[in-house]
UniProtKB/Swiss-Prot annotation:
Localization of this protein: Secreted
Organism the protein comes from: Conus textile (Cloth-of-gold cone)
Post-translational modification: Contains 2 disulfide bonds that can be either 'C1-C3, C2-C4' or 'C1-C4, C2-C3', since these disulfide connectivities have been observed for conotoxins with cysteine framework V (for examples, see AC P0DQQ7 and AC P81755).
Name the UniProt record assigns to this protein: Conotoxin tx5e
GO molecular function: toxin activity
Amino acid sequence: NIQIICCKHTPKCCT
């Protein structure tokens, strides 16, 4: 989902 995609681009989004 968006969170996973964001995590790939920016780890900050993951946390």
